[in-house]
């Protein structure tokens, strides 16, 4: 799959804050998700991200902005998100209606996902205790120590390699309102060193009582994750489960079928899988009669080299 620009955030359509010299009619501040970005390779651009962000705050009714998408802020290798986090924290008294932030809306044409340099992003959550949705793209340099946040409902990490330290930080966090959690775990080559053991506190249940959707996706150990999920107490409280984008084979599917019932789910996403046709049918036969929507689209492409079979996650570099 390809990583694309966000088209919406928090139920609001994305709108690109215009560059200097452009004067389109702007929508009401609370009606769109504002995307603020700069192009470091545009020789005609005369402002960096800090200047662009200040211009944004001065141009729109900042106190009415509900959703903010942070796009490219500089050259990927040379600029992590630390300065962006500081800008967001400094603006907390102006962005008093902010409910959703996505940090790193950067596509491969700008920088590969593994090139996006992040930082400790939790100061944003601490600065905005009323925030409801927070998403991050890029795992390099990403830090997420355990936090307490009473109102966050959606938390997502899109990476080609999510550090185990981040997974442990999420699992140790106090997020009583969290309903939706999505983590692209990625591959070890790009920093995705999380293990099933790192997921254990999360899967044990009790930490996030409001959680209704769990996505543990894009992993090269997707079979092991499926086996852990199959026995996880947390699953009983879920309405939907996403194990897509990873190297999920018949072994992982067999673990799901042999584990606890999944017939209470509204849907389960297993796309980008490596199932045999017979296993795919077994999954459908086990779940669809109970009304579970089963997504088995986009089978992964195997490659064979000198008798060895290679399987890949959907997103890595």
Which role does the model predict for each range below?
Residues 83, 285, 305-317:
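Short, surface-exposed amphipathic charged segments that create phosphate/polyanion-binding patches used
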Residues 122-132:
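A broadly conserved amphipathic alpha-helix scaffold signal in soluble, globular proteins
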Residues 16-22, 48-57, 79-92, 112-123, ...:
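Leucine-rich repeat
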Residues 32-44, 69-76, 102-114, 130, ...:
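Concave beta-strand-loop units of leucine-rich repeat
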Residues 1-82, 88, 92-95, 313-317:
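N-terminal alpha-helical scaffold/docking segments in eukaryotic complex subunits
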Residues 96, 208-218, 226, 253, ...:
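Long, charged, low-complexity, helical-prone intrinsically disordered regions
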Residues 87-88, 95, 100-105:
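Amphipathic protein-protein interaction modules
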């Amino acid at each position: 799959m390809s990583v694309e620009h966000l088209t919406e955030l928090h139920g609001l359509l994305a709108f690109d804050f215009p560059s200097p010299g452009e004067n389109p009619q702007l929508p009401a501040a609370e009606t769109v998700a504002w995307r603020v970005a700069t192009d470091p390779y545009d020789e005609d651009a005369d402002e960096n991200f800090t200047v662009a962000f200040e211009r944004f705050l001065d141009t729109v009714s900042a106190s009415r902005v509900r959703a903010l998408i942070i796009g490219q802020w500089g050259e990927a290798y040379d600029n992590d998100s630390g300065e962006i986090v500081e800008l967001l924290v400094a603006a907390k008294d102006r962005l008093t209606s902010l409910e959703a932030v996505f940090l790193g809306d950067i596509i491969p044409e700008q920088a590969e996902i593994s090139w996006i340099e992040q930082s400790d992003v939790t100061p944003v959550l601490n600065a905005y205790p009323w925030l409801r949705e927070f998403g991050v793209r890029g795992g390099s340099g990403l830090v997420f120590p355990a936090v307490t946040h009473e109102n966050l409902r959606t938390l997502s990490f899109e990476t080609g390699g999510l550090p185990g330290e981040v997974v442990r930080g999420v699992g140790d966090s106090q997020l009583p309102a969290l309903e939706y959690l999505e983590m692209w775990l990625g591959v070890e080559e790009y920093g995705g060193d999380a293990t099933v053991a790192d997921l254990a506190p999360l899967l044990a249940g009790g930490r996030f009582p409001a959680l209704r959707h769990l996505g543990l996706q894009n992993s090269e150990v997707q079979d092991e994750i499926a086996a852990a999920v199959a026995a996880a107490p947390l699953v009983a409280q879920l309405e939907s489960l996403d194990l897509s984008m990873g190297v999920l084979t018949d072994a992982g599917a067999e673990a799901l079928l042999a584990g606890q019932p999944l017939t209470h789910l509204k849907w389960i996403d297993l796309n980008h899988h490596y199932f045999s046709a017979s296993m795919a049918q077994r999954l459908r036969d086990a779940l669809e009669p109970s009304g579970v929507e089963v997504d088995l689209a986009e089978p992964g492409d195997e490659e064979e080299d000198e008798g060895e079979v290679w399987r890949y996650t959907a997103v890595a570099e």
